[in-house]
Amino acid sequence: MTAYWISVYREIVDEAKVAAYGALARPALEAAGGRFLARELPEQTYEAGESTRVVIIEFESVDAARRAYESEAYAAALAALDGGLIRDLRIVPGVG
């Protein structure tokens, strides 16, 4: 069953660190089978929605998404991020 990596950026602390992270994270996650579906600010928010960057990545399974997060390549991206960002990251199984 497909799974979705959903990341909501709460606060960008250091733009340079976020850029360094992005340069490493995208290729690491794509190499692990991730397919980027969205990466941007919302066009519209409702209810308690905040206008902060959202990233949605599709994986073939929850296990594939977990393996991507735990990979050496993604660990290097996290090391580059080094506190430059406060975010909410979830891995959610797809429906059906």
Give residue ranges: language-model regions:
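Short S/T/G/P-rich N-terminal loop/turn motif that feeds into the first structured element of a domain
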Residues: 1-53, 60-70, 93-96
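C-terminal structural segments of small proteins and small subunits
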Residues: 65-90
